[in-house]
Swiss-Prot record:
Protein family according to the UniProt entry: Belongs to the Orai family.
GO cellular component, one term: plasma membrane
Gene this chain is encoded by: Orai3
Pfam families, per database record: Orai-1 (PF07856)
Biological source species: Mus musculus
TM region positions: 63-82, 95-115, 157-177, 239-259
Regulation: CRAC channels are regulated by fast Ca(2+)-dependent inactivation (FCDI), a mechanism that limits Ca(2+) influx and cell toxicity. ORAI3 subunit displays prominent FCDI. Inhibited by lanthanides such as Gd(3+) ions.
Positions of modified residues (Phosphoserine): S42, S45
Annotated compartments: Cell membrane
Official protein name in the record: Protein orai-3
InterPro entries registered for this protein in UniProt: CRAC_channel, Orai_sf
Entry keyword set: Calcium, Calcium channel, Calcium transport, Cell membrane, Ion channel, Ion transport, Membrane, Phosphoprotein, Transmembrane, Transmembrane helix, Transport
Record's catalysed reaction(s): Ca(2+)(in) = Ca(2+)(out)
Molecular function GO labels: store-operated calcium channel activity
Amino acid sequence: MKGGEGDTGEQAPLNPEVDSPAGSATYREFVHRGYLDLMGASQHSLRALSWRRLYLSRAKLKASSRTSALLSGFAMVAMVEVQLENDHEYPPGLLVAFSACTTVLVAVHLFALMVSTCLLPHIEAVSNIHNLNSVHQSPHQRLHRYVELAWGFSTALGTFLFLAEVVLVGWVKFVPIGAPMGKPAPVVPMSQVPPVTVSLSLASNLTPSSASITTSQQPSKACPPRQVCDSAHGPGWQAAMASTAIMVPVGLVFMAFALHFYRSLVAHKTDRHKQELEELSRLQGELQAV
């Protein structure tokens, strides 16, 4: 190959059959034109990316507002409508956990609902304008952290609290059913119990047969209906334990799905950015070679 053949090849038109100068282009002009087209496409893609972020923020705020309104309303109804048995001694930790979980659940979802209510009208107003340059008028870029915080509170933290709320409601509601009133007292001779003079005086007026009937009916109070006296727990405790045993695997599956989903989403975004960087590197190498 001679020395001038390379330059002549670069200056030769890509389409030699076209005789008009406007219809022919050298390789250098072709690469330059491709670079300009890519820069224009990048500007267009940046604008399209801004619109995509706007629509994504709007969708997240809408989803978080609907979810937060539903779950917070359920938590409030659960706290108001739950009926506590006065004659049952609840564990103090159970009532404290139920009250704290309900309060935190309502507070988290109300915060997400407040962010959605404040930001969503401004984003909706900009998205309804049919102008490509109007995307910069939306506050979703500047308040991106609040959008993500509301989305995380509503979908991640709020859902975990809701699962815990369901478990606690089951314990508060079902534990008193069939629960023993207390341990049966040991049998003590009546002669060794001086404080019960009133009951003895009342019992003296009864016939021996009626007194035997009343004494035979007293132990049944310590064992409510639908419960075996020998069992330590009633059917309510078994129902609450069943709901807990079901909800624990559901929570683990939820955590696994959330981690897998966000990991796949991050991997997809990383691959897309990697492909764009490789395209820019290839074009830069072609320009430097020319």
